[in-house]
Amino acid sequence: MKRSNSIAVMLVLVLSSLMLLLPVEGQGHEGHGVGEILLMGKLGAPVCGVRASGRVCPDGYCCSQWGYCGTTEEYCGKGCQSQCDYNRCGKEFGGKECHDELCCSQYGWCGNSDGHCGEGCQSQCSYWRCGKDFGGRLCTEDMCCSQYGWCGLTDDHCEDGCQSQCDLPTLLPSPLRRIIAIRKLKANLANMLS
């Protein structure tokens, strides 16, 4: 009898844990269910603001309307609760430059996409750029320079038309390059959080 009770209790615990990960329409952060939010709070973005008794984010992070810390427009834009100008830059923000070598877009947001570093970029516009159109500039951190002059580790950067630093990453299979890129991003994020 004790054994069947133990199994039943264990089954209930396992099933209830799985149910926490099911998305709940209209609840949580960006369509995530409550269980996902709890997981994100533990493994991902720290909680902040009203839902966390007024706790603020680590330096450099905005507290979103949902009560999570981050650096993108989703966190620092509409509904942001505190530290909302971290990922902002440019003339409308007193000439503030972006952190971590990111480009300042024409709209005053920090990032490294073509929308940030391309036409209209306000400052630090060439960090993610490379190649013949940028004075032969090489990429940092062992990244390839794509045919279009962007630094990265994807097939688009390291294969057809790659301008420089193409050899080492192309010796690695594509999934491994993605893993390396993800690890570098995680390391950068960990450095920002510490």
From Swiss-Prot:
InterPro entries: Chitin-bd_1, Chitin-binding_1_CS, Endochitinase-like_sf. Residues 45-86, 87-127, 128-168 form the Chitin-binding type-1 domain. Pfam families: Chitin_bind_1. One of its GO terms (biological process) is positive regulation of mitotic nuclear division. Keywords: Chitin-binding, Disulfide bond, Lectin, Mitogen, Repeat, Signal. One of its GO terms (molecular function) is carbohydrate binding. Disulfide bonds join C48-C63, C57-C69, C62-C76, C80-C84, C89-C104, C98-C110, C103-C117, C121-C125, C130-C145, C139-C151, C144-C158, C162-C166. Residues 27-44, 171-194 form a propeptide. Residues 1-26 form the signal peptide. Homodimer. The homodimers are asymmetric; formed in a 'head-to-tail' fashion via hydrophobic interactions between aromatic residues of the carbohydrate-binding sites of each subunit. This is Lectin-C. It comes from Phytolacca americana.
